[in-house]
């Protein structure tokens, strides 16, 4: 019996269908993103700028300012990566296409060609938004990976994006840049989430 039931005599209904939905918060948007490899030099420069900026603005209570990233010189949209190709590539690797996404913890939105979409495993979400028939942005969220099968699916999926589409992964939270055409780099990065 829940707290509301005890205090107010209310019956709360938990919708178990919503529990496994891919979920992201607004602050996570493109924080760990997959982008064209042509952006590598720009990203390496940005990482150095971020490191200098954090040294200047760090205090014992956090930071005194916010770093605003510039747009990438080679946006994912310019690669004309088709939605149908992208989704087929990922679902063939064993990920599931979501019909809905939980946004900011409570809002549930339907996936469509004009909204954010997700393809996921229980421990890994690959989000993307679209413009017409093409992928606009790709970003991920990863939780604790406890299955060897899931670990291998994620490695193979990210590697396929690196090999077939020459993509790289940038984690702006930790300033980690991963060449997705290098399985060793992918595995090393994912070990942060492995249990």
Question: Positions of the model-derived regions?
Answer:
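Acidic (Asp/Glu-rich) sequence patches and key acidic residues
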Residues: 2-195
